[in-house]
Each structure stands twice: as structure tokens, then as C-alpha cells.
Regions:
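Short amphipathic beta-strand/extended segments with alternating polar/hydrophobic composition
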Residues: 20-28, 77-82, 113, 195-208, ...
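An acidic/polar, Gly/Ser/Thr-rich interaction patch typically located in mid-to-C-terminal regions
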Residues: 28, 32-57, 208-350
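Amphipathic, non-transmembrane alpha-helical segments in extracytoplasmic/periplasmic proteins
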Residues: 45-48, 102, 115-141, 155-179, ...
Length: 350
């Protein structure tokens, strides 16, 4: 196993088409990063290499790549996908740099192909599995509660499987992601995996593993007291509303979902999903900690020792693992949904 040179202290392993190239690129590696965000349909990875003399063989699009990194607890797989692009840049005095970008979803495959199909009286889980099979997806895993949500009618009208999954995720308050030949639909803000298991908590402790923080536990603009969606009721010949109240007495503004739902059940799901997004956006920020491969979008981050009003629990919205020539593995966490003592300072005002 290759050990990174001075500054790159993390044991790493990079496989291209199943071949270990860690040692071959060791002296050329400038920076490596892997990003996993709940709002994007696929994980991304980027490898930046010193391409002096143009000696590195230019990578082909669609080549498979795996990246394994190690933290204090051991090594783990952090990315599996395919090369999406390769970019060369250089100038007269700065040398040459080759940047290889990869995505967890096969963007060359049928997942991006537009489909024309519809479903009558179908569950979300069943609709995703059928559309996924047509897109070459071998396995679709859906949170058990989400899988049972039924719709009287669903359609893909010139819509890809990727777009279909993201649309359903927005409508039911979920996160959709494609990883290789698998697709996942999990609840947002629930802190659970697609099978319903708890994701755990990642600590960020000042004086221990916390490098830096930039957090605003209270953001006023996204806050609302209620989320409301509507649908047209043909029996009553008028629009009906479905609402979800939010536990926030700092505002009396109501969030109105812009587009109407197909029926009452869909409207209730849209209102609940919008309420979850409001809660998530009520605070925001980021922390950078020692490399921690346990961090996943949807898990909790417990910030301690920063200061009163900042310390507390936050939901992890995105994770980026990175290392370069000047530092060992670090993990950046984008945060939202402040909880517990976040935003509270019990000290008396001066």
C-alpha cells in the first residue's frame, strides 16, 4: 500500500479498471477530493495531477475508478464510479496540470435517456424499480415508508430516470442518488439509511478534531410558520389545501408550494416535503475536521467547544473528503437543520 509523501500522510488506494495505480501516480498527486451531497444525484471525485511534460496517459471517458482512503479508524471505500471528463491546463511559467473528474452515476449510460411511460395506481417504490430497470439500474433501494406511498397516476413524459427520481424525491421529502448500478431513495432529515437504520453522529470538537467552523445557526429568510400545497378536487369543483405547521413562532409567513399536486395525498406529501426543507434551511454552515469516513449526508454532526450559540447538533447536508500536498486527509461537512442547543446562548445579556 502506497504511503503519500511529505504532507500527504493518508494511506490511499486508487483503482482504474481494477488496476491499482496508487504507486504510479504517487509523486504526481497534487490534490484528491470526493464529494457526496444530498442534493445531487451522484457522488463526484476529482484528482489533480502534476502533468509535467504531458507524460501522463490521457484518460478515456467512461473508465471505471475506485478510491479508498483511510482515517484513524481504518481504510474504506469512499468512491466508485466512472471518469466523466479530463481537463488539461497550463501556462508558460506554471507547468501543466491534469484534472480528472468522475461521477458515481454512469453519465454515459441509459440513466440519462428520456423515457415515455406512465403508471396507474402504483407505489413510488414500484414505479422507481420499473423505470430504473429500463435505465439499466440493477437495484433500486427505497426507504420502507417511502416505498409504500401510492399514486393514482405517475408519468415520465420525456423525462430521464435521473430526473424522475429527483422529482419524486422533491415531492415526498427524500434524497435520490445513483451509485454505480444502484439507485437509492431515502428520507431527508431522518438520519437513517435506505433500510431505515440510524446513521449515527459525527463529532466536531474544538481542541480535538475540529480545524475550523463557519456556522450561522439562525437564518431568517428561509423560515416560515407553515407550508401549504393545493390540489384540484373534481368532486367539489374547487381547489383544496393541505398544510403542515412548523414549530417556529419567529415568523407568521406561510410557504405556498408553487405548483398544484395531482390529488390530496400528493398535496399532503408536498406540504410535508416543503416543511422539511424549511427546517433544513433554518440554519447553515460548515465545519472542517480530521478525516472521518463515517460522515455521510443525512447523519448528525455534534459541534462542541466552538462557543455558546454555535455548539449543538446539525444535520450533515454534504461531505467532502480531501487531501493535498500540504495536508493530510480532512473532511468538510456542510450543515443545516440546527437542533438542540444550536442557536441558543444561556448566558445573560451584558
Amino acid at each position: 500500500m502506497a504511503e503519500l509523501p511529505v504532507g500527504l500522510k493518508t494511506a490511499h488506494r486508487i483503482l482504474v479498471e481494477g488496476r491499482d495505480v496508487s504507486t504510479a501516480i504517487l509523486s504526481r498527486l497534487i490534490r484528491l477530493s470526493v464529494r457526496d451531497a444530498s442534493g445531487q444525484a451522484a457522488d463526484t471525485a476529482e484528482i489533480e495531477l502534476d502533468d509535467r511534460g504531458g507524460s501522463i496517459v490521457f484518460p478515456r471517458a467512461g473508465v471505471s475508478i475506485e478510491i479508498r482512503l483511510a482515517d484513524a479508524r481504518g481504510r474504506g471505500l469512499v468512491f466508485a464510479g466512472k471518469v466523466d471528463s479530463a481537463r488539461s491546463r497550463g501556462d508558460r511559467s506554471g507547468g501543466r496540470i491534469l484534472t480528472i473528474s468522475a461521477k458515481g452515476a454512469d453519465v454515459m449510460g441509459r440513466a440519462k435517456q428520456l423515457q415515455e411511460r406512465h403508471f396507474d395506481d402504483v407505489t413510488i417504490g414500484e414505479a422507481l424499480r420499473i423505470a430504473g430497470a429500463a435505465a439499466g439500474i440493477e437495484e433500486v433501494r427505497v426507504d420502507p415508508d417511502l416505498a409504500q406511498i401510492s399514486r393514482t397516476y405517475l408519468a415520465l413524459e420525456g423525462e430521464s430516470f435521473l430526473a424522475f427520481g429527483q422529482r419524486l424525491a422533491r415531492e415526498v421529502g427524500a434524497t435520490f442518488k445513483v451509485v454505480g448500478s444502484r439507485a437509492l431513495l431515502v428520507k431527508r432529515n431522518a438520519g437513517t439509511t435506505a433500510s431505515g437504520r440510524p446513521m449515527g453522529t459525527v463529532p466536531a470538537v474544538a481542541g480535538d478534531n475540529l480545524f475550523s467552523w463557519d456556522i450561522a445557526p439562525y437564518v431568517g429568510r428561509p423560515r416560515h410558520s407553515r407550508a401549504t400545497a393545493r390540489h384540484y378536487d373534481p368532486d367539489q369543483a374547487r381547489h383544496q389545501q393541505s398544510s403542515v405547521d412548523l414549530d417556529d413562532d419567529s415568523t407568521d409567513a406561510e410557504l405556498i408550494v408553487r405548483y398544484g399536486a395531482a390529488d390530496g395525498a400528493a398535496a399532503q406529501d408536498q406540504a410535508a416535503a416543503s416543511a422539511a426543507e424549511v427546517e433544513r434551511a433554518g440554519g447553515s454552515g460548515s465545519v472542517t475536521i480530521d478525516g472521518d469516513l463515517r460522515a455521510k449526508p443525512g447523519a448528525l454532526c455534534e459541534v462542541r467547544g466552538a462557543r455558546p450559540g454555535i455548539d449543538g447538533d446539525y444535520l450533515i447536508d454534504a461531505v467532502e473528503h480531501s487531501l493535498d500536498r500540504t495536508s493530510a486527509l480532512t473532511t468538510r461537512l456542510d450543515l443545516g437543520l440546527p437542533q438542540g442547543t444550536a442557536g441558543q446562548d444561556a448566558r445573560r445579556s451584558a
